[in-house]
Amino acid sequence: MKPANVTDRIVFLGSGGARIVVARQIRASGGIWFCLDGTMFLVDPGPGALVRMTASRHDLNPAELEGILLSHRHLDHAGDVNNMIEAMTMGGTERRGTLFAPSDALEGDDPVVLRYLRGFLERIVTLEPGGSYELGGVRFACPVRHRHRGEVYGFRFVVPGLSVSYIADTSYFPELAEHYRADVVIINVVRLEQSELDHMHVPEAIELVRAMKPRLAVISHFGMTIIRARPWVVAQEMSEQTGCKVIAASDGRELDLSEYRTGGPG
């Protein structure tokens, strides 16, 4: 049963990325809680997801989740996935929920999802490039494999009147704009300036926002260079350079997406 007062919203259980930021918890790393059209799910439960959720002032109950989505197996995105499966299923006493994850998070010599927990779930779905999926009232796709170590996907979610994209870790490539165009776009931007890392930096994010023209862009998953530059200042400068509304995620921040919903399908 979905709560009657649910609105379209997202809550950032963390806004940090990169190894030093996560290891020192300079910014939290718990992922993103989504509620779209009454369907609640968690994306990328990194270290501290369960603690951040249960301590949140936003009344987040893991037993109300319908699913967990992993963009990839790296610990800053999947470190708390097993704890969250336990919490979602009440320690395995209620078999429920769906886990969506790339194949290398589930199989091979070093999977990040413990095998003994898998029977707690109703479904486990392996993500594929170009794949389309459903969870509750939400349709979503993994439009393209990202250019990052391992098997990495982003998500484009659609409910009636609203589309939301999450662009997970990747090096920049121009086709991202076409694949992830949406009303609201969340972009993982780790670096302030160009580097050899396979992560997006601010000038590339500016180019991407210009091409996509979302109604709202949210930058998150910050490394130290952006944190030192103050993410809210970086976001304001991006707004000025792109002509689009750009804001910076912060730990515990809730965004009401209802103002971005229109009358037609996403």
Task: Give residue spans per PLM region.
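Active-site neighborhood of phospho(di)ester-bond hydrolases with catalytic His/Asp-centered motifs
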Residues: 42-46, 66-76, 102, 164-170, ...
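Conserved beta-strand hairpin/beta-sheet module of binuclear metal-dependent hydrolase folds
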Residues: 2-57, 151-168, 184
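Short helix-capping segments at alpha-helix termini
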Residues: 90-94, 116-120, 239-245
